[in-house]
Amino acid sequence: LKPDFTPDYDLIAQKAPGAKVCHIQRSRGYTQRNAFDLATIQKVADTARKANPNAVIFVDNCYGEFTQTAEPVAFGADIMAGSFIKNPGGGIAPTGGYIVGRKDLVELCAYRLNAPGLGKELGCTLETPRDMYLGFYYAPGVVCEAIKTAIYAQCMLELLGKKPIPRYCEAHNDIVTCFDAGTAEALIGFCQGIQAASPVDSYAAPEPSPEPGYTDEVIMASGSFTQGSTIELSCDGPLREPYTCYLQGGLNFAASRAGVLLAVQNAYFKD
């Protein structure tokens, strides 16, 4: 990516020859950028494929499912994957993930997961298919609630002088909102407010702590029915300047709105 977090198409074309996979992460991770829209994914795929027709275009679609009326496999991706404890599980699926795309590539993934030649015909399901299918059925509506929550939070944060990404009036290509909390105390207070408004473990007060894979301490708030679920209202952020907070999820707008209000109050109006 360029310093402004847009794809460097010249560098992509330079690096593509000889590469087996072009990996596109749709959502932002711990960076301050918008999620890639479908047109950008298409352009990255076209650039890589022109430089290397044999490259597999893979999209990590986490947080992006059902935010638009189409998915990356319709915009240049050969294969994509995501998690059922995020958007496509609808807050109901307790575990799992999905892989979708070209049949030959999906079969190769199944062979690697289970056994060559047996693929998806083998393997345990942990008695979860019903919940997975039910969650997937509800997922588009749940994602709509999460986006409504994001837009509400973005409006609220702008009234406080913050600069959320994305803005309420911009296209939403994932369910995440990030903004600079300004201070460590505000970041911690916001996360603790989200936790206090959660339906599970609302009595807990999250604190920053070291996390494997991160260079800074991280604070995470998630009072969710499913451990690790981020389609449920949650937020987190690394304890480093400018103390960026990442807010996502919301199974229903009514409860999530209360969570946003409590988080803002706890971060900026404690006195």
Per-region residue spans from a language model:
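Conserved PLP-enzyme active-site core in the AAT-like
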Residues: 1-137, 143-144, 148, 157, ...
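Generic alpha-helical structural element
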Residues: 98, 142, 179-183
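Conserved C-terminal alpha-helix-loop-beta "cap" of PLP-dependent enzymes
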Residues: 158-270
